């Protein structure tokens, strides 16, 4: 997979992309990440990319010239238009695990990091295929959201993570929050690992994990249950959990 990031501050990405899973994914040729400085495509001698907004108002707006030039540069590099051109934007669609999985199916994507008050609307109309928000808050620029998107998408590329099962069982991948994890020692400062996890009984462990996953989702993100692919067994467990929680509320 090839990911190109259009940014005014390429140096911001050095740390996150040169360590851990993303570093190994690049070394193995599973993911290629290109950092493109938008200023390199400015058409004026001062390499500025922003200007005052027509109609007045506060702040500056990123103009179309450099952004068009940068996207066209990526198209020339690959010999075709990028699969998706994604703008990091607080007005965008909320970024979810399902959205990450959708982007991971593309061969090439371009992430555009906005700055200032925003970008010229003609860039949106002519180039941008997606607009993504990572939350209902405003950041200084699109660089941090782009890092989040790259991390979430790259780990879904086949081969990047060692075990496909691990990816499938993570929070949100199956519509539920993930179950609790434990490792050695069996007891730490009086806190013990649940006995079922030490039993070696795979079916009982599966049931316990599923129950815990349902409980966490019910307690922390109940709205997710409406979209989760619940089985008949899941629904029975939820009835039991709701009854238990109601008893606690009444006691």
From Swiss-Prot:
One cellular component term from this protein's GO annotations in UniProt: cytosol
Top EC class for this record: transferase
CDD domains from the UniProt entry: TrmD-like
Keywords: Cytoplasm, Methyltransferase, S-adenosyl-L-methionine, Transferase, tRNA processing
UniProt-listed GO biological process terms: tRNA N1-guanine methylation
Major subcellular site: cytoplasm
Matching Pfam families: tRNA_m1G_MT
Entry's family note: Belongs to the RNA methyltransferase TrmD family.
Job of this protein: Specifically methylates guanosine-37 in various tRNAs.
Protein name: tRNA (guanine-N(1)-)-methyltransferase
Organism: Pelotomaculum thermopropionicum (strain DSM 13744 / JCM 10971 / SI)
């Amino acid at each position: 997979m090839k990911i190109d990031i259009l940014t005014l501050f390429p140096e911001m990405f050095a740390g996150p992309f040169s360590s851990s899973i993303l570093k190994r994914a690049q070394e193995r040729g599973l993911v290629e990440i290109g950092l493109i400085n938008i200023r390199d495509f400015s058409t004026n001698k001062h390499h500025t990319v922003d200007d005052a907004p027509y109609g007045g108002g506060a702040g500056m707006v990123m103009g179309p010239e450099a952004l068009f030039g940068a996207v066209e540069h990526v198209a020339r590099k690959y010999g075709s238009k990028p699969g998706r051109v994604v703008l990091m934007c607080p007005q965008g669609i909320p970024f979810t695990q399902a959205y990450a999985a959708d982007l991971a199916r593309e061969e090439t994507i371009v992430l555009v990091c906005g700055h200032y008050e925003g970008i010229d609307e003609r860039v949106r109309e002519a180039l941008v295929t997606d607009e993504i928000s990572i939350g209902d808050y405003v950041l200084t620029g699109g660089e941090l959201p782009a890092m989040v998107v790259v991390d979430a998408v790259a780990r879904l590329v086949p081969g990047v993570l060692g075990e496909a099962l691990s990816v499938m069982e993570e929070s949100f991948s199956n519509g539920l929050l993930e179950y609790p994890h434990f490792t050695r020692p069996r007891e730490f400062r009086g806190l013990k690992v649940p006995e079922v996890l030490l039993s070696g009984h795979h079916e009982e462990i599966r049931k316990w994990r599923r129950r815990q996953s349902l409980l966490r989702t019910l307690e922390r993100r109940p709205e997710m249950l409406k979209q989760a692919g619940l089985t008949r067994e899941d629904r029975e467990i939820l009835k039991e959990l709701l009854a238990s929680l109601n008893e606690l509320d009444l006691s």
